Amino acid sequence: MNATGAGYPLASLYIGDLHPDVTEAMLYEKFSPAGPIMSIRVCRDIATRRSLSYAYINFQQPADAERALDTMNFEVIKGRPIRIMWSQRDPGLRKSGVGNVFIKNLDESIDNKALYDTFSAFGNILSCKVVCDEHGSRGYGFVHFETHEAANRAIQTMNGMLLNDRKVFVGHFKSRRERELEYGAKVMEFTNVYIKNFGEDMDDKRLREIFSAFGNTLSVKVMMDDSGRSRGFGFVNYGNHEEAQKAVSEMNGKEVNGRMIYVGRAQKRIERQSELKRKFEQIKQERINRYQGVNLYVKNLDDGIDDDRLRKEFLPYGTITSAKVMTEGGHSKGFGFVCFSSPEEATKAVTEMNGRIVSTKPLYVALAQRKEERKAILTNQYMQRLATMRAMPGPLLGSFQQPANYFLSAMPQPPNRTFYSPNPVAPVRPAPQWASHQSRPPQYQPPTPLMRAVQPRRMSSNISTMKQASTQVPRVAQHSQRVANIGTQTAGARAQVNPSMMRTMPHYKYSCGVRNVQPIVSSTHLQQVMEPAVLMQGQEPLTASLLAGAPPQEQKQMLGERIYPVIHEMHPTLAGKITGMLLEIDNSELLHMLESPESLHSKVEEAVAVLQAHQAKENAQKSAQPSLI
């Protein structure tokens, strides 16, 4: 299978039938041996954040994705065999039905893997699935071949064959609309007639005598109960459609045994249920349209208000067709409905009565809404609030921590060494990826280490002694902005510094206890600003500029290649899982952790604690299982 063709421009796989507890870290550990992975995403419900039981994995190389598809399909994760197929981003290809085969009358023992193994001999399979419910297989499935020719070969060979001693039907997949059109054409040519309401005094012989007058009857059957008595309905099958149609036209509504019988086309149970459902929905929609804009919902009613009092209060605003106070056990539930004859009258009643005090309680009056409408409105409001909360900037982390002593030296030193400040200039919550393209406010600075060029020291008498005079934080916001601008941003390009600005910019030293900031006279000028780099043995230095310049799909891979060896030294057996968990963190924070071993070690220990707690929970469940049996 050519994964690099026009059908599959990306090396992306769809992973289906996942256990709800499967996470990205588990999938990373499972699929990373196949090759470098750019991204993994488990799709979740937008409201509940529960897994939808499928995921997407993007490999760097199509060959790695194809290897995973060939070798890992139907492997078991958390007790469930997974189903892997190419991610088809074109919905037209998925919905066209070209190469899609339908199989029915399958034995219950046939699962996805058995069906795949049976039909893979006819060509490349894009998707294979046996439809199941909570009780197991439903006896049918689908196989989607890459080409129409492969599907034809499978149909010609397998249709009517025995699979596990059951004769299966194999044919081209047809959409519901196509099936309904075909079935509708067959229905118009019916030969089987259904008769009901003829009572208990009827048998096959007498029913044949009555209906044989309209044509040749192939079979006649009166349905009986366990005692041998008629259940009041039966079937008559004619040789052709014209005879059956004549029997329906002549006998429907006639009297037999003193009863008016019903005669019509025989229907399958699912067809009858669909027709009844369609009629019910039609009646429901007519009722909704009839009361649209004229039915009012009234709540906060006093317990003493009944139907007559409710009608009396709203009568001045128009003709009322119905007024009802909802009760339970003879007691008012505090709300009711008033229906007017026209929308104009209902609108006037809402305007006049909403908020009016009736029997010491203010009424709430509004147009009545169906439960589905209210649920949709509430869901929409909730999602809007959720989106607003996500779009709002988060609170600053560590905003109550006083920074350590920052100062820029005035001593001449060579520009070939880099010094890193012990704390970031502006510790903030790392921005999520979905907000990475939004403009930042002017006062925002990414969490980047403050650095300066380090030169050979010599004594300088112009550095004054700092006093711990007060615990009040000095007002140095303007200078903090300048100092922060000297550092390089982790998500931006290499910082550009204007030499003239560097010469005129005053240098300060800070202390948590001083009220005023003392300027330091610099005898030399900073010639350049060095960018922090993460050095790993055998790999090129990783800087913020280098990371930002890489394509988004490669940034996680670059960080993972540098994080994994460090984690492997601390926890060799859990390195894969922990790496996958940490790669979900924002890139800027990952880069900061690589620069700060203490931060990385802390995050690793947190991940280990989470994994150990999860493992302990699973062990407890396993140990408790035998006692439940």
Swiss-Prot record:
Lineage top rank: taxon: Eukaryota
What function does this protein fulfil? Binds and protects the poly(A) tail of mRNA with or without an AU-rich element (ARE) and prevents mRNA deadenylation. Stimulates the translation of mRNAs to which it is bound during early development.
The cross-references to CDD domains, in alphabetical order and at most eight, read:
RRM1_I_PABPs, RRM2_I_PABPs, RRM3_I_PABPs, RRM4_I_PABPs
Q: Which UniProt keywords are listed?
A: Cytoplasm, mRNA processing, Protein biosynthesis, Repeat, RNA-binding
Q: What assembly does the database describe for this protein?
A: Interacts with dazl in an RNA-independent manner. The C-terminus can self-associate and also interact with the C-terminus of pabpc1, independently of RNA. RRM 1 and RRM 2 interact with both eif4g1 and paip1, and the C-terminus also interacts with paip1. Prior to oocyte maturation, found in a complex with dazl and pum2 proteins and spdy1 mRNA; pum2 dissociates from the complex during maturation. Interacts with the translation termination factor sup35/erf3.
Biological process (GO) annotations? chordate embryonic development; mRNA processing; mRNA stabilization; negative regulation of nuclear-transcribed mRNA poly(A) tail shortening; translation
Name under which the protein is recorded? Embryonic polyadenylate-binding protein A
Species per Swiss-Prot/TrEMBL record: Xenopus laevis (African clawed frog)
